[in-house]
Every structure is written in structure tokens, then in C-alpha cells.
């Protein structure tokens, strides 16, 4: 009797190694085939784990448990068949749970802002001299942390886990643990429609997010989000944060951060490094979680000073000076839905040349489209969604757009457009931003938003290099 792992992403790879380290019989299956997957296949097969690539999923004889990577739908036909046969089906995060349940957790979920909030919390623990491992949907998979903890290679004080709706959907036992078990603190960053093609309804999507807070001892919610502001009274022991309301547990007054009425830090430098009100919201959420975990204000202050931002989230990757005009290239590949695309545009000053598109998600693009109309000088569209996005823009009478075949071409065309725009500026010293903020998933052309962001960075740096020759 063995264990079958579906998906050979980093989570599936780690889950297989955790099972094998316990002496269990493991098979891994992935319907895709690529050079990266073959490298992982070779690594696992050296550890005695058979791997099947490039074949449709099928249940193997003698399997007693199927472990599901986050990218595989929880209602996949193979999983439905496994359940009919009485085979246990668990998510990768749940597999890690028995090895980590003795530790306190900060669990962080939400539509947008999860990763930055998670990284900020981990930084606050680090400055306080505690190892709070950022993991889950960011950094290390939970099963990798579980393996290293079980083997004695790590002794973390806390787990700081970003948990996606996919992971929460597949972690029912984790979320039904006895009262008082981790997560000690549950954080809900934002809530807007996303992943409806997988979860079906907004109510189901919200339900998976709410699981985390229902099990937590303490909860932190974003009072700037209307849905979460309404729900803040649904649970006891709930902190809420606000950019302006002094009744909140954590709030801003001017540029000063207050926690429980006490001034903690000035945020001018942070706002310069991490632009946008959404990043201030992320910081307030992280500060609230750290405070509840007993992190002193001095460590929170130190983390605010040292935090440099996150890759693929309004990350400035290059700058080219054209006369007096700086042209800045900003990588916001993590913007995989319309809300995140709106947040990026709202955080930046015009003029902006926007590169958008990819694989469209369900959702209402109207607010994003209106902000494009108000702030964006030109839109360059790529990927599967390009024709539909072009039509939506034309319907609001926005016509300064172009559909292009690849990101490489879009970066080159964006630079040409920026150079032309620079000549027409009233203030030649005014920066122009070339922004990759797709508002779409990456899977039509890339393996992940990180893959897309790395490619954008490489294109920009190659452009800079060609101009220096």
C-alpha cells in the first residue's frame, strides 16, 4: 500500500520526499513534461521514488492515499474516483501538518497582499531574533519545512504560512484541529472575486478563506476592505487595521503607525520603497500579527526599516535615461487578476505604458478599465486574453492600444513608445513608467507568474545592455 503524489511542482516534489523519508512507498505523477520536471524526476528517482511524466493521471494499484499539489483541482475526476474507492485524498499542506502542529502558526490568506504580508511578518520575527519561516504558498513548501523540522535541520520558533484558497480547500483536517491548536493567528488581507473558475461561487471561495480565521485563536482583518470590515465582528479576538480610522487596533495618523494607541514607527521611507496604499495595508496587517505574537515594537520598527519589498510586486527592474526623462521598468507580474492590476495602477503616477494580458480570470474589469483610461498613455496586450481585453478597452473608447505576440516584443515596443512620449512631456524630468501588470494568469505562455516576471526582467536588462553597447 503506497502514496501517490499528483503534480511535480515544488510542493509535490517536497511532499514525495517527506513521505519517502518516513520509509513509505511513493509514486509521483504529472501530466506535463519539461526539462525542469525531468530534473526533478531524476532527483526523486535517485531517492527511490518512481515518477511518471507526460501521461494522463491514473490511479495506481495499491494506493491508500493520494496527495494533491495546490495546482490540481480538488474536484478532478481522478480524485473523485479515488474517493469513490475509499482512498484518502489530502493536500500537500495537510500532509505536513502532523510534523508542525506543535509549533505556533501565523496563517495568512486573502485575494491579494498575502505574500507581502507574509514576508513582512517573517521579517519582524527575524529582527526580534526568532525564526519565523515564511512558507506555504511563498518560499518553502510546508512539506519541505516539515521534513527539515522532523530531521532536526530546522528548529523554527513559529511558522509564518501564506495559505491560498487552493491549500485551504485541500486541508480540511488541518482546519478542523482541536481548539487552541495552531494557527495561533489568522490574517485575512483582502477579499475580491478570484479563482471562480475553480471554486464556482464567491460564497465557496469566501468559505475556504474563512476556515483559517474560524480555527485561529486571534484574527486580524483589513478594515479597508468593505467585505472584511463587515465581517470583523463575526469572530471573537479580532484585530482590525485601518489607514485612517483611529478606532482600529492598528492605524495610521499621517505617516505614523499606531498599535493599540501607541505611536510605533514613521513610514515615509517605507512608502517610498513600497509604493501604494495596498502596501501600507499589508504593513498594518503584519504589524498587528507581530504584536499579537509578542514581537516588541522595536523589532517591528527595525523590520519596517529593513524590508526591501517583494519580487514581481511593483519591483523596479531597470531604468533608462532618455535625455532628461527617466524611463522606469516595473515588474508587477504577481498581478494575476483585475483587482491587483487596479492596485498597481493606483500606486503609480502617470504617465504609464502598460503591458497586460495572459490567461483571463473571471471577474469584473470595469474599475481596472476606468483607471487605465485615466492614467495610462498606451496599452500593449499579450497572451490569450489580448483580443477580449482590446475589445473591452475599445468599448470604453480607449484606442491607444496594440496586440503583440510576445513579452519580448512588448518590452521593445514599450520603450519606443516611452521615447516618443518623453519628447512630448511638458516637464522633461517627469519619469515614465513601463509597467508589466498583466491582470491575468500566466499559464498561457509561462509556468508561473514568477517565470513571467523573470522573463520581463531579463528583457528589460537585455534592452539596457543593448543601449550601452
From Swiss-Prot:
It comes from Synechococcus sp. (strain JA-3-3Ab). Pathway: Cell wall biogenesis; peptidoglycan biosynthesis. HAMAP family: MurD. Cell wall formation. Catalyzes the addition of glutamate to the nucleotide precursor UDP-N-acetylmuramoyl-L-alanine (UMA). The lineage of its organism: Bacteria, Bacillati, Cyanobacteriota, Cyanophyceae, Synechococcales. InterPro entries: Mur-like_cat_sf, Mur_ligase_C_dom_sf, Mur_ligase_cen, MurD. ATP binds at residues 110-116. SUPFAM superfamilies: MurCD N-terminal domain, MurD-like peptide ligases, catalytic domain, MurD-like peptide ligases, peptide-binding domain. Pfam families: Mur_ligase_M (PF08245), MurD-like_N (PF21799). Keywords: ATP-binding, Cell cycle, Cell division, Cell shape, Cell wall biogenesis/degradation, Cytoplasm, Ligase, Nucleotide-binding, Peptidoglycan synthesis. It catalyses: UDP-N-acetyl-alpha-D-muramoyl-L-alanine + D-glutamate + ATP = UDP-N-acetyl-alpha-D-muramoyl-L-alanyl-D-glutamate + ADP + phosphate + H(+). GO terms for biological process: cell division; cell wall organization; peptidoglycan biosynthetic process; regulation of cell shape. The gene is murD. This is UDP-N-acetylmuramoylalanine--D-glutamate ligase. It is an enzyme of class 6 (ligase). Its EC number is 6.3.2.9. The keyword Protease does not apply. One of its GO terms (cellular component) is cytoplasm. It comes from the Bacteria. The keyword Cytoplasm applies. Belongs to the MurCDEF family. It is found in: Cytoplasm.
Amino acid at each position: 500500500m503506497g502514496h501517490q503524489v499528483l503534480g511535480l511542482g515544488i510542493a509535490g516534489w517536497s511532499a514525495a520526499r517527506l513521505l519517502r523519508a518516513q520509509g513509505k512507498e511513493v509514486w509521483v505523477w504529472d501530466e506535463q513534461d519539461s526539462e525542469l520536471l525531468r530534473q526533478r524526476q531524476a532527483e526523486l528517482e535517485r531517492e527511490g521514488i518512481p515518477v511518471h511524466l507526460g501521461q494522463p493521471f491514473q490511479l495506481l494499484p495499491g494506493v491508500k492515499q493520494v496527495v494533491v499539489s495546490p495546482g490540481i483541482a480538488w474536484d478532478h475526476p481522478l480524485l473523485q474516483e479515488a474517493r469513490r474507492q475509499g482512498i484518502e485524498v489530502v493536500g500537500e499542506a495537510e500532509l505536513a501538518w502532523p510534523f508542525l502542529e506543535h509549533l505556533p502558526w501565523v496563517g495568512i490568506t486573502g485575494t491579494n497582499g498575502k505574500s507581502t504580508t507574509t514576508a513582512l511578518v517573517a521579517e519582524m520575527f527575524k529582527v526580534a531574533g526568532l525564526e519565523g519561516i515564511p512558507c506555504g504558498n511563498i518560499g518553502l513548501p510546508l512539506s519541505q519545512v516539515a521534513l527539515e523540522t522532523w530531521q532536526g535541520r530546522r528548529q523554527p520558533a513559529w511558522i509564518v504560512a501564506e495559505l491560498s484558497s487552493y491549500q485551504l480547500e485541500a486541508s480540511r483536517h488541518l482546519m478542523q484541529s482541536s481548539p487552541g491548536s495552531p494557527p495561533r493567528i489568522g490574517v485575512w488581507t483582502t477579499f475580491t472575486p478570484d479563482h471562480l473558475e475553480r471554486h464556482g461561487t464567491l460564497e465557496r471561495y469566501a468559505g475556504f478563506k474563512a476556515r483559517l480565521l474560524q480555527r485561529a485563536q486571534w484574527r486580524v482583518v483589513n478594515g479597508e476592505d468593505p467585505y472584511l470590515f463587515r465581517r470583523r465582528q463575526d469572530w471573537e479576538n479580532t484585530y482590525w487595521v485601518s489607514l485612517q480610522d483611529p478606532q482600529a487596533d492598528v492605524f495610521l495618523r499621517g505617516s505614523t503607525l499606531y498599535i493599540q494607541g501607541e505611536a510605533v514607527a514613521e513610514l515615509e521611507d517605507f512608502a517610498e520603497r513600497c509604493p501604494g496604499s495596498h502596501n501600507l495595508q499589508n504593513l498594518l496587517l503584519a504589524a498587528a500579527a507581530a504584536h499579537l505574537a509578542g514581537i516588541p515594537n522595536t523589532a517591528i520598527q527595525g523590520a519596517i526599516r529593513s524590508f526591501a519589498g517583494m519580487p514581481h510586486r511593483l519591483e523596479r527592474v531597470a531604468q533608462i535615461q532618455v535625455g532628461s526623462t527617466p524611463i522606469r521598468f516595473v515588474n508587477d507580474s504577481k498581478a494575476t487578476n483585475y483587482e491587483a492590476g487596479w492596485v498597481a495602477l493606483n500606486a503609480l503616477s502617470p504617465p504609464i505604458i502598460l503591458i497586460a494580458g495572459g490567461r483571463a480570470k473571471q471577474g469584473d474589469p470595469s474599475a481596472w478599465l476606468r483607471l487605465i483610461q485615466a492614467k495610462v498613455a498606451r496599452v500593449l496586450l499579450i497572451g490569450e486574453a489580448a483580443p477580449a481585453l482590446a475589445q473591452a478597452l475599445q468599448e470604453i473608447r480607449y484606442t491607444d492600444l496594440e496586440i503583440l505576440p510576445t513579452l519580448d516584443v512588448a518590452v521593445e515596443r514599450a520603450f519606443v513608445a516611452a521615447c516618443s512620449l518623453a519628447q512630448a512631456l511638458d516637464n522633461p524630468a517627469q519619469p515614465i513608467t513601463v509597467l508589466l501588470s498583466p491582470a491575468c494568469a500566466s499559464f498561457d505562455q509561462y509556468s508561473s507568474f514568477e517565470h513571467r516576471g523573470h522573463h520581463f526582467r531579463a528583457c528589460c536588462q537585455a534592452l539596457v545592455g543593448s543601449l550601452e553597447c
